[in-house]
Amino acid sequence: MLSNPLHRFSGYHAMPSNTLMSNGHMSQGHLHNNGLDGLGQSSHYALQQLQQHVGVHNPHLARAAPHMKHHRQHPYGPAVRTAGIAGPIRRRISRACDQCNQLRTKCDGNHPCAHCIEFGLGCEYIRERKKRGKASRKDLAQQAAAQAATTGSSSGQKSPTHSANTTKKDDQKVDGGSSTGNAPNSEQHSPDDKDLDNDAMQRSQRMGSMDSLDEMDHQGHISGHHHQQAALDREHHTMSNPSALDPNSYGGVHNGYERQGGMGTATSHIMGGAAHGGYGSQGGMSSYPELPYLQTQSPTGYSGGGASYRIGTSPLSAYPLSGETASPGWGLPIPSPPASHGQYHSQHMQQQSSASYGAGTSGGLASGHPQHLRYPVLDPLVPHLGNIIPLSLACDLIDLYFASSSSAQVHPMSPYVLGFVLRKRSFLHPSKPRLCQPALLASILWVAAQTSDAPFLTSVPSARGKICQKLLELTVSLLKPLIHTPSGDVSPVSSPVIDGAALGGLGVAMPGSISMEALSGETGAFGAAGTLDDVVTYIHLATVVSASEYKGASLRWWNAAWSLARELKLGRELPQNAPSAMSDTAGNERNDNDDTTEALGGGPNVITDEEREERRRIWWLVYIVDRHLALCYNRPLFLLDIECDGLLQPLDDTAYQNGEFRPHQVVTDPDMLGEDRRSSQKSETALIRGPSFECTGHGIFGYFLPLMTILGEIVDLNHARNHPRFGINFRSHSEWDEQTSEIARHLELYEQSLRRFEQQHLSAAAQAQAQAADAAKAAAAAQAQAHAQAQAQQTSSDDSAISADNISVTDVGTPSALSVHSVAHSAHTTSSSRLTESDVQTRIVLAYGTHVMNVLHILLTGKWDPINLLDDNDLWISSQGFITATGHAVDAAEAIGSILEFDPGLEFMPFFFGIYLLQGSFLLLLIADKLQSEASPSVVKACETIIRAHEACVVTLNTEYQRNFSKVMRSALAQVRGRVPEDLGEQHQRRRELLALYRWTGDGTGLAL
């Protein structure tokens, strides 16, 4: 099985980022590697690229005096240059390499230096040469002259040769620190540019401090962008669009991705507060009004300074996303990459490609791609990605997102990927990939970066937190939550008025953008500006927040996903000749990736079977999460069964990934057909529509979706019983019993389907082994009961020993030695038979399905709230329902034993499993609390199994409620074994206080603290 995918990463331990910007003094072959990004990129990803562009010759090293390059033994000392006069040998180096300068380590001045060779780093000398002290007016005048010369050459006033020579001379003057300047050109320099240059030169005095590097992330780049602008002009003088070189715009973005390509006047600016003054003036990140719906407050005891970099409209602004407790690192300034640098980076990549991005190209797939862009699907995101991560790492993160943890079945490896709704083969197609919104691509990278082991994310402890923070900011800025307006549309301020209200900036589709199909109610959404990609992006954001300690904040994102899915009418099947949303959104030719899709997809601009399946899978995924969170947070259902009553169930994951789509559904009336045609159509249409109650596959849509359908019925029943006016006393008991019996029948149908699933997918050898394992468990249970009776007869002291098998119990807080011995014997039996991977996956599905099914039985007949369960004011413990629920609790604990045998880390469904483990344990806690030493051996063993499972959950998905309940269960198990502490009353009070945090009463919020 996989190692722990979640808790081993301590993401979001943020510290000031080190982003050194390169300037015009670098050669045009160099890449923009700076700060931490340069460390990871050059050490693992871009070393080959750097060697290709940098080469052996380094112009920066060549600028040193000839007699100096042989005397670079000592790394320290004043940087004094001689003027060609022979002098004493200087035991120092004139300049350290970029890596040693960044890491503050000793450098020998060679290329490559010894330090970089030892640690496998890319040795470079491409950073700007700076002088101490404030920049002189003459230097500023030289910069102004160079800028004026660049402007003149780009406007055609000078020939290319003359322009290049002038620029070269200006570069030499500036680099050499010449004191001569041109006064008229200095006067033409604008005051704003002078202020920026002065400010940047003042900040350059603080290069000795790592914190000052963050402050120079923006201004330092602006101060040196003039020479780089000249180099770009010479390389891209044939481009017809002048705005492509505007540092405040993304002129090179393709029109096909106009909605998300350029961050123009309508693009939202999610960063709020005075901390973003350095970026507020950039035209590429204009703001939109903040919505209170998405704002949040900092948790108690968590302070963020006024200069903190926040996401004003994200629920993650004050919350860490890892399983750790709140980290003060989130209050530190985390600069965002300047918009201009993303443009320079993309243009530099375009320069290396054989075909550049055309400013007027519709769609980016027809144009050339960067040489190392392995997956062209990332093309729309390249202009926005900037210097956050290398493109090679982005491709690796895409691979991780679609990685499967099993060779026999398709199962997501990342714990934050709940199920595959996108088809990998279509997504990663080398020539015609699926057309995606940049926000979706950024969210995929963000999700994969949470658990990636890439050196770029692990070389420095704070690297993962900073990279994930930047990817999160990029995702939300591209998504524009609740807005979803294309960037090329008019701004919300100047949008047309509809019935006296300006609605264009609130995510409402404007007149003329609604198709007739949407008006008829068959396809599309009336008044919705979002797309399928936006729903998936919301799912990614909400999933990561739900896995953190701040689960309540995830409801904001889930509500947005559910609402948009309903607006897009994903719960309905589309007509046969419905238009394709892909062609409408991208303005490019239809994306037919393989012969199968083309054969089943119909004519041009008609929705394909793959798009239909995407719609189904997205709907059923949000349907699953809606039912799951209704139990977690004690909330009513959002999505109704009637909304998807005619929607087909998703395909099997393996069939979907292989492109084995269903045949088209015949819409002819069966009464109009002959008998043979009617029987043929019946066989084709024998597909499951609407919610189902039977297990059909190994994936989340096969075994877990039916359980969530039944859970939705239980949630509705529970809220109806607890209604303040129309509750338990408003209807007769017979009506409640009939509804309960119907839900129990659905659970029986699921249990029968599990048996058929076992016979269908489990090999004969595995079935025989399963029967032998069941017999061994029965024998072990009988042996445990005999040992317990012998122990009760022999002694009543706290330190008594179990004589059988010479095994002693040494710790009441751990599982009994007998149970551990039996489990070890079972594991040995399992390993000796060498189950195939397919059999292991089937056994895992059977174990998880059996456990959740038994928990649903408990929820149907028992109580949800732990305090009400312990108080037992209505004497439910003496009813038949309690006896029935107790049997299911023991069966659920036995299923957990099977789960721990085949999935020791509980990594198969860590996002969903915790709440069912908790609700299935409340009843065992009640028995242990009430009966104590009189509890049966099966109950004691079940409590031990529950403790082991919670310990595994804490390692895999470290959440507070699991740690708290593990303490409560340990205390109760100690009392069952006769260990009564002196402060028994205080322990009971602490136990009650911990359980009181999670209430499922009328106004309780469950796990959402």
From Swiss-Prot:
Swiss-Prot/TrEMBL GO biological process terms: DNA-templated transcription
Organism: Pyricularia oryzae (strain 70-15 / ATCC MYA-4617 / FGSC 8958)
Region (Disordered) location: 134-264, 329-365, 576-607
Consequence of gene loss (knockout): Reduces growth on D-xylose and xylan, but not on L-arabinose or arabinan.
DNA-binding region: 97-123
Coiled coil: none
Predominant location: nucleus
Keyword Ion transport: no
One of the record's GO cellular component terms: nucleus
GO molecular function, one term: zinc ion binding
InterPro entries: Transcription_factor_dom_fun, XlnR/Xlr1, Zn2-C6_fun-type_DNA-bd_sf, Zn2Cys6_DnaBD
Task of the protein: Transcriptional activator of the pentose catabolic pathway (PCP). Involved in the induction of a variety of PCP enzymes during growth on D-xylose. Has no effect on cellulolytic and xylanolytic enzyme activities.
Compositionally biased spans, kind Low complexity: 141-157, 340-359
Pfam families: Fungal_trans, Zn_clus
Record protein name field: Xylanolytic transcriptional activator xlnR homolog
